């Protein structure tokens, strides 16, 4: 529950999320198609920054150091006879000194074991911090084994989730889904009625789409990695030999399977080996539009030939697929091609990158370009020249074009009041009815939104809505593709077409209904001091209901709600009487949904029926029984949720306490953060991650605070960071850390902070602003160190252009090396082939450190690794290094090496002592 009094709120074993920018898992399906990953039960991939195996940090390292100390005494022992020649008095003095040395060494050793290492051993008393809804099902975490890093990195603590590929039947039937698995009789790929899963006689019989998981074409075995059934369910589009490009994009060989005959043919029979970047079914199921070599093609199934829609695509000109920066920062997908609902038109982007500067990314071991070097050139790195616009540099020029399928004609529509070519970012395209299409665009700095309505039949367009968001609250427009078209239905009280969009309203993001399409004035569907999330989720056109996920109960929670299209009768579908974090996926007609409970207790999934006033549960499809067993067997950290107030802003905090937490002890504290604009790291999902390992196995407290700039705490707190990234965010981390340093159970001399990507930037910015007064240590992975080095679309959204805001860029850059030198020590790690946050960031930082004679840092590079740092076991090594480095920090090892001096041998010290004692 949301608390405003600042009191602690105990909870179940609640998780923390991982921001996309840390290292988002790649999607492999298009936004408008279905794939095997999105259709079928699957094991959720381990969270992006903790995959792979990894050895635990153990005590061997510290025993080795002790052994080294013993070795240093060997010269003294081997030289003892020489000392004995000085007579009996000298011998007595000698043995007294020996005993004193040995006694001192033993005392230091005992103190080291009982004191120095107590920080990661558990105490005897357990904090009773779990209620009836606990993931453990008990009120104690005192029993069980510690969480291991190997388990976390191997994904053993990840909940198992299923995704349902809802499809509309050929006659618009609701409740149909695509499933895979089973023998040849059942069919490998089939369409089932959700009502048939429980033996309901009203359900339709299954329809087999693919009998076997492998199909043969001219004797060649095709093993598809993704599938896309046609809307009429008579064909299936297959992809094989799929290869990843960037985060969302990929290429592969495409095939069309006929359901009746179970035979397949290449998508383009004239080029069966051609690698295709994108393929999309026509809503009429009679054609496929696809992209190859950055050109757009149409394959009508009635013919074996294809029609070239565009012909001049190439290295600098893209049709139908996004370039790197649009894929990463605007669309978050691999498709910028959209069929009209009546299949008469195709809208697509034309992206011109000619003026965009290139950035070279080098690969020293692998050759992602696929090019075989010429003889004698094998020892040179493979170089990918990426068109990467940095702040202030030319952006790609993106235009929206249209293809008339019947006339085989490409055209564009000029609209008055459009942004100039170098000042336009198209963030969403949405088809309406009768050839009309809505286009949402922003200016380059993403603080002015314009919505255009284009009529492709008359080839005219007009501006229908404009919002100056910067003038409203100093904020920005976040790209999204969640706007929903609502068709006219006079019988149901909708005389005109309309659409539902998310807009700023009284300081929070809420749902607004615009009807007719050219009406700039909205009917607000939601309001209040909370926000909707990626809304709406679905619209029930028959009953006039809008479904959405929101934070009405608390910023850290997600519940499912519905509201009438007139804004009345807003009610929750999920149980809001206790903390919860839900997600939902609706069937085509919204009569059914897959409800996913993600925490705080053990996650589960169920099919629900939404036809009545209250939901009914049709089928429980996942309860994560294996997680229940693991929770019972392992000692998970206690998570305490609370609010803190900094400069009048209420911020969400979660504190992970080690099992057997003893308030009489003094614990080291690790702060973990991401902190990017609009992000959220403190939430109520069940997660056992690297932070859980640190608390459970190492015995440290881990604190996360979502400071100003993060999401779901209101636009005032979010927008204040614009133009000066890092200042308020770091201030909030430091202010919260000072609160923790004052707690009786915290060792204020052992406090660290770490993060990845934006979190890496925030780690360095916090150390810079703090100058060693609160945090002694920091660990930054793949950090931005100067926002002039990051991509233009993301950076200018929050910082304006460098020409517009030079002082802001200067302030946000990591520049104060003297302040960094005040920390005890910090660690920086980076993938050498990072195409997202370029290695340039860390190299320039190192140069600044060198020029300032700063030496209190460690640095590690990982060859051929991108932003997620996976290449050749690198991900395992990253977390191994983080864990070991942190243990060394909190054990005081970095103090010992801070100012190294030659160590005089013990024998020389003894001789000097003897001379002083001699008469």
From Swiss-Prot:
* Stated role: Type IV dipeptidyl-peptidase which removes N-terminal dipeptides sequentially from polypeptides having unsubstituted N-termini provided that the penultimate residue is proline.
Q: Where is the composition biased (Basic and acidic residues)?
A: 1-10
Which ranges does the record mark as transmembrane? 93-113
Instruction: Identify the residue ranges that face the Vacuolar compartment according to the record.
Output: 114-919
| Topology of this chain in the membrane | Single-pass type II membrane protein
Q: Name one GO biological process term.
A: proteolysis
Q: Where is this region: Disordered?
A: 1-53
Entry keyword set: Aminopeptidase, Glycoprotein, Hydrolase, Membrane, Protease, Serine protease, Signal-anchor, Transmembrane, Transmembrane helix, Vacuole
Q: Name one GO molecular function term.
A: dipeptidyl-peptidase activity
Main localization of the protein described in the UniProt heading: membrane
InterPro entries assigned to the protein according to its UniProt record, in alphabetical order: AB_hydrolase_fold (IPR029058), Peptidase_S9_cat (IPR001375), Peptidase_S9B_N (IPR002469), Serine_Prot_S9B/DPPIV (IPR050278)
Q: State the compartments where it is located.
A: Vacuole membrane
**Entry EC number(s):** 3.4.14.5
The residues annotated as the active site are: 757, 834, 867
Q: What family is this protein classified in?
A: Belongs to the peptidase S9B family.
Name of the protein: Probable dipeptidyl-aminopeptidase B
């Amino acid at each position: 529950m949301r608390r405003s009094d600042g009191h602690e709120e105990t909870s179940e074993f609640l998780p923390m999320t991982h921001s996309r920018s840390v290292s988002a898992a790649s999607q492999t399906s298009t936004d408008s198609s279905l794939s095997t990953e999105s259709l079928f039960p699957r094991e959720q991939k381990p969270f992006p920054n903790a995959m792979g195996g990894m050895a635990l940090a153990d005590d061997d390292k510290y025993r080795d150091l002790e052994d080294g100390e013993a070795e240093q005494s060997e010269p003294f022992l081997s030289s003892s006879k020489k000392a004995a020649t000085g007579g009996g008095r000298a011998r007595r003095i000698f043995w007294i000194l020996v005993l004193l040395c040995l006694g001192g060494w033993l005392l230091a050793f005992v103190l080291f074991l009982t004191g120095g290492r107590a920080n990661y051993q558990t105490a005897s008393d357990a904090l009773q911090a779990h209620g009836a809804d606990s993931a453990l099902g008990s009120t104690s975490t005192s029993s069980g084994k510690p969480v291991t890093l190997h388990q976390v990195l191997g994904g053993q603590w990840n909940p198992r989730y299923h995704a349902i590929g809802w499809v509309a039947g050929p006659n618009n039937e609701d409740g149909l889904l695509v499933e895979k698995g089973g023998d040849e009789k059942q069919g490998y790929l089939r369409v089932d009625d959700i009502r048939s899963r429980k033996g309901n006689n009203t359900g339709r019989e299954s329809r087999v789409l693919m009998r076997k998981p492998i199909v043969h074409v001219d004797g060649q075995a095709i093993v598809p990695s993704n599938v896309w059934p046609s809307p009429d369910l008579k064909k299936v589009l297959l992809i094989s030999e799929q290869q990843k490009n960037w985060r969302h994009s990929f290429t592969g060989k495409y095939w069309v399977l006929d359901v009746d005959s179970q035979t397949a043919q290449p998508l383009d029979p004239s080029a069966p080996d051609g690698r295709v970047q994108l393929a999309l079914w026509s809503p009429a199921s009679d054609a496929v539009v696809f992209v190859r070599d950055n050109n757009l093609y149409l394959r009508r199934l009635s013919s074996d030939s294809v029609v070239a829609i565009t012909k001049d695509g190439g290295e600098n000109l893209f049709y139908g697929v996004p370039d790197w920066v649009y894929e990463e920062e605007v669309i978050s997908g691999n498709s910028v091609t959209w069929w009209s609902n009546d299949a008469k038109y195709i809208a697509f982007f034309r992206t011109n990158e000619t003026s965009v500067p290139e950035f070279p990314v080098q690969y020293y071991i692998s050759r992602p370009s696929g090019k075989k070097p010429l003889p004698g050139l094998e020892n040179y790195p493979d170089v990918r020249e990426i068109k990467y616009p940095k702040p202030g540099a030319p952006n790609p020029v993106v235009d929206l074009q249209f293809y008339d399928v019947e006339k085989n004609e490409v055209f564009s529509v000029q609209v008055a009041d459009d942004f100039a070519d170098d000042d336009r970012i198209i963030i969403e395209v949405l088809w309406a009815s009768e050839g009309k299409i809505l286009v949402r665009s922003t200016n380059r700095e993403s603080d002015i939104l314009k919505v255009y309505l284009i009529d492709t039949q008359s080839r005219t367009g007009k501006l229908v809505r404009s919002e100056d968001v910067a003038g409203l609250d100093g904020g920005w427009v976040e790209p999204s593709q969640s706007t929903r078209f609502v068709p006219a239905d006079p019988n149901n009280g909708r005389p005109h077409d309309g659409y539902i969009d998310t807009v700023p309203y009284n300081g929070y993001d809420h749902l607004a209904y615009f009807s007719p399409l050219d009406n700039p004035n909205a009917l607000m569907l939601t309001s209040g001091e909370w926000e909707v999330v990626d809304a709406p989720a679905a619209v029930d056109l028959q009953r006039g209901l809008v479904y959405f996920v929101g934070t009405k109960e608390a910023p850290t929670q997600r519940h499912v709600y519905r509201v009438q299209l007139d804004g009345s009768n807003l009610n929750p579908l999920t149980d809001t009487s206790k903390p919860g974090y839900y997600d939902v996926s609706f069937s085509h007609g919204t009569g059914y949904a897959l409800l996913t409970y993600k925490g705080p207790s053990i996650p589960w999934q169920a099919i629900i029926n939404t036809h009545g006033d209250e939901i009914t549960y049709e089928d429980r499809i996942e309860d994560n029984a294996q997680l229940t067993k693991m929770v019972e067997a392992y000692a998970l950290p206690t998570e305490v949720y609370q609010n803190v107030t900094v400069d009048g802003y209420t911020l969400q905090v979660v504190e992970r306490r080690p099992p057997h937490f003893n308030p009489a002890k003094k614990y080291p504290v690790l702060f973990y953060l991401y902190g990017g604009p609009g992000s959220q790291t403190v939430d109520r999902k069940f997660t056992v991650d690297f932070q859980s390992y640190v608390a459970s196995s190492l015995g440290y407290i881990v604190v996360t605070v979502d400071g100003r700039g993060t999401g779901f705490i209101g636009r005032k707190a979010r927008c204040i960071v614009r133009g000066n990234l890092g200042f308020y965010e770091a201030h909030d981390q430091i202010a919260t850390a000072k609160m923790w340093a004052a707690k009786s159970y915290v060792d204020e001399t052992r406090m660290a902070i770490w993060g990845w990507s934006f979190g890496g930037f925030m780690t360095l910015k916090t150390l810079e602003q703090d100058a060693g007064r609160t945090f002694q240590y920091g660990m930054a992975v793949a950090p931005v160190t100067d926002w002039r080095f990051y991509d233009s679309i993301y950076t200018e959204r929050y910082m304006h252009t460098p020409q517009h805001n030079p002082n802001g860029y200067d302030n946000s850059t990591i520049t104060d090396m003297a302040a960094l030198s005040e920390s005890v020590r910090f660690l920086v790690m980076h993938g050498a082939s990072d195409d997202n946050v370029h290695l340039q960031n860390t190299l320039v930082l190192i140069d600044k450190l060198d020029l300032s004679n700063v030496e209190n840092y460690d640095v590690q590079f990982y060859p051929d690794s991108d932003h997620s740092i996976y290449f050749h076991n690198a991900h395992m090594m990253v977390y191994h290094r983080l864990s070991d480095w942190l243990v060394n920090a909190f054990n005081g090892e970095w103090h010992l090496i801070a100012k190294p001096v030659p160590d005089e041998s013990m024998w020389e010290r003894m001789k000097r002592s003897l001379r002083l004692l001699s008469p």
